[in-house]
Amino acid sequence: MHIVVVGLSHRTAPVEVREKLSIPDQSISESLKTLSINSDILEVSILSTCNRLEIYALVKEINIGISSIKEFLTDYSSVNFEDLNPHLFDFRQEEAVLHLMKVSAGLDSLVLGEGQILSQVKKMMRLGQENQSTGPILNRLLSQSVSAGKKVRSETNLGTGAVSISSAAVELAQLKIGQDHGVDGLVSLKSEKVLVVGAGRMSRLLITHLKSKGCNRLTLLNRNIERAVNLAGDFPDLEINCKSLNELDKNISLSSLVFTSTASEKPFIDLARVEKISLNNKLKFIDIGVPRNISNDVKHHAFIESFDVDDLEEVVSRNQEFRQKIAKEAESLVKDERIIFLEWWASLEAVPVINKLRSDLELIRKEELQKALSRMGPDFSARERKVVEALTKGIINKILHTPVTKLRSPQSRDERQASLKIVEKLFSLVDDE
């Protein structure tokens, strides 16, 4: 059995490729079922975020397993394999384990140390368990990876400060507005006419960061206006005007800064649409949806600047140097967690031998006990029989304790295999060739 991961991320693919492989929450279950049907895949779990799509699997054979996952990704995205494959990466065994733990810790994120990825890994673990696509190996790996993410955030300063896609989007707005006014740095958003489209978790984070950067009023649009009203209610000190998505064009015309973050699978704002809108201000669009909410052709509008998640790199690079120093400390913690998992995984190799040894000794115990009891005659009470039964079980457990502990203890693969062969030979656990 082998652990592999196949996927793509902001490091390997632009947003126009990533959005074709974004698997929404409501489609995860079906995708897990499709992958699980493959006999080469023993366990599988999917991580889908705005910046990455990664499939972790326990497979019978590495190359066949990776090929099967790539075939699934090709079918799902409807992109030719020759066009998709250059954007895909794969890691195997120890590298796959380390990669997931680094992802969980925020060490592989666009915004180094961002906190949202940890909850996304937790969700990946929950969905795998709910759909019964994961088993003891991946469940343990995912649990250990969550522990790694928590440890990095509690024992280092990597997670401090504004580190999320939403916060980077707000900082990008500050930076671009500042540049318009000849300011090299971040400016207040107090005077901006802000429109937020979408009322999900990312929009909640957007509003939180907008508030911290000086915004005291904004318009919130959502297809379900009740959801927008509920979200606005969580910010009583902000003036939030909630509208239906049907009023999008009107509210775009009244805005100077528009953030979009919806679960739409296709862009709903394109150049043809905005050309019909009478703009009262120069306008900035910042789209953090994946798939994108705003078509790329909007960038051709003379009075609109349009940005997507790939443009956040400009903001991220401003504070990466400080975080890179902390990241080295975090990577050391992650590697420690990897060792813990790998030692546990390696110890499973001993389980069949241990079980066979227990089974053989239990058979001997029962046979010898039965012989002894038959010689004791009818005068031997049931209570006395239970005492002798417990005694013989205790002796077997005492005999097994040291060798079983040794076999399960941390050691190299060669050392463990040598120990297993000795035990198998001494106790005749395998047939002689």
Swiss-Prot record:
Superkingdom assignment: Bacteria
UniProt record, GO biological process: chlorophyll biosynthetic process; protoporphyrinogen IX biosynthetic process
Short name of one Pfam family: GlutR_dimer
Gene3D superfamilies referenced in this protein's UniProt entry, alphabetically: Glutamyl-tRNA reductase, N-terminal domain, NAD(P)-binding Rossmann-like Domain
GO molecular function, one term: NADP binding
Catalysed reaction equations from the record: (S)-4-amino-5-oxopentanoate + tRNA(Glu) + NADP(+) = L-glutamyl-tRNA(Glu) + NADPH + H(+)
Record-annotated active site: 50 (nucleophile)
Keywords from the named record: Chlorophyll biosynthesis, NADP, Oxidoreductase, Porphyrin biosynthesis
Enzyme Commission numbers on file: 1.2.1.70
Site feature location: Important for activity: 99
Positions that bind NADP(+): 198-203
Residues the record lists as binding substrate: 49-52, 109, 114-116, 120
NCBIfam families per the UniProt record, alphabetical: hemA, PRK00045.1-3
Family annotation (HAMAP family): Glu_tRNA_reductase
Miscellaneous comment in the UniProt entry for this protein: During catalysis, the active site Cys acts as a nucleophile attacking the alpha-carbonyl group of tRNA-bound glutamate with the formation of a thioester intermediate between enzyme and glutamate, and the concomitant release of tRNA(Glu). The thioester intermediate is finally reduced by direct hydride transfer from NADPH, to form the product GSA.
Domain notes: Possesses an unusual extended V-shaped dimeric structure with each monomer consisting of three distinct domains arranged along a curved 'spinal' alpha-helix. The N-terminal catalytic domain specifically recognizes the glutamate moiety of the substrate. The second domain is the NADPH-binding domain, and the third C-terminal domain is responsible for dimerization.
Family: Belongs to the glutamyl-tRNA reductase family.
Function noted in UniProt: Catalyzes the NADPH-dependent reduction of glutamyl-tRNA(Glu) to glutamate 1-semialdehyde (GSA).
Subunit description: Homodimer.
Entry protein name: Glutamyl-tRNA reductase
